Amino acid sequence: MTESFQHISVLLHESIEGLAIKPDGIYIDGTFGRGGHSRTILSQLGENGRLYSIDRDPQAIAEAKTIDDPRFTIVHGPFSGIAHYAKQHGLAGKVDGVLFDLGVSSPQLDDAERGFSFMKDGPLDMRMDPTSGIPVSQWLMEADLDDITWVIREFGEDKHARRIAKAIVAYRENEENEPLKRTSQLAKLISDAAPKSFKEKKHPATRAFQAFRIYINSELEEIDTALKGAAEILAPQGRLSVISFHSLEDRMVKRFIRKESQGPQVPHGIPMTEAQIQALGSANMKAIGKAIKPSKQEIELNPRSRSSVLRIAEKL
């Protein structure tokens, strides 16, 4: 692995253990990243086992192509297409385990040219797949005040959303200013807009950068579709292992597993026959254990793991 691709997979042992790997099983790593989870799964598969990995980042695909293993297949695309890819390969209902490692990876954050980090100057891009969609810089030049405010508040949970949005709009409307195209420009703009009473330990731009990244990549919609797709293609007793990194992601995963574990709900106060109740179906999955967080040792080794949460479910 090249130096630029070095990456410490978060909750590696716990997430793979949660899949309960069968040597001859079929597995899907929905977020290849730099391959830490995929390589570990491959190391536990026998000759007849199969691993299919997915990623929409061209750099991740390039790294995946260095794996010369007949048991391994890489798919270039968003993980929301997991059900479609599984059906293409004749895997629907046959998959023994699916793993998702959500959010942005360390190599993406550390590569200034990708524009994900406010700590490094680079193009204000933030796209997971730079070949599709529009960069954040273009969106910020076109979006109105209300839209920018909504994105920061909804996806960054930033109480200063309106204040930051006003600063961005005021900046771009001043003809004397350079176009807003660099991460350092946006980070400074947000820092300057933060109230003097700002006392959070995090950088003032943390939440807004997260919000713009989530929005420009439609991350929450991707997660919702991917979770539903995974539940659809898993075989009975197949496992779903999901690592999230912020509260928006984790709430989605938690609610999904809870909903799938409860099954269809009978409307309160509406009389129904036993046959009608049975026709609604039953629970589709069950939660395996409680949410798992990284150990103190892992956090010391990899501080970025601090906010991670692992949840595991099993198809019934």
From Swiss-Prot:
Its EC number is 2.1.1.199. SUPFAM superfamilies: Putative methyltransferase TM0872, insert domain (SSF81799), S-adenosyl-L-methionine-dependent methyltransferases (SSF53335). Keywords: Cytoplasm, Methyltransferase, rRNA processing, S-adenosyl-L-methionine, Transferase. One of its GO terms (biological process) is rRNA base methylation. It is found in: Cytoplasm. Its main location: cytoplasm. Signal peptide: none annotated. GO terms for molecular function: rRNA (cytosine-N4-)-methyltransferase activity. S-adenosyl-L-methionine binds at residues 35-37, 55, 79, 101, 108. GO terms for cellular component: cytoplasm. It catalyses: cytidine(1402) in 16S rRNA + S-adenosyl-L-methionine = N(4)-methylcytidine(1402) in 16S rRNA + S-adenosyl-L-homocysteine + H(+). Specifically methylates the N4 position of cytidine in position 1402 (C1402) of 16S rRNA. Belongs to the methyltransferase superfamily. RsmH family. This is Ribosomal RNA small subunit methyltransferase H. It comes from Vibrio proteolyticus.
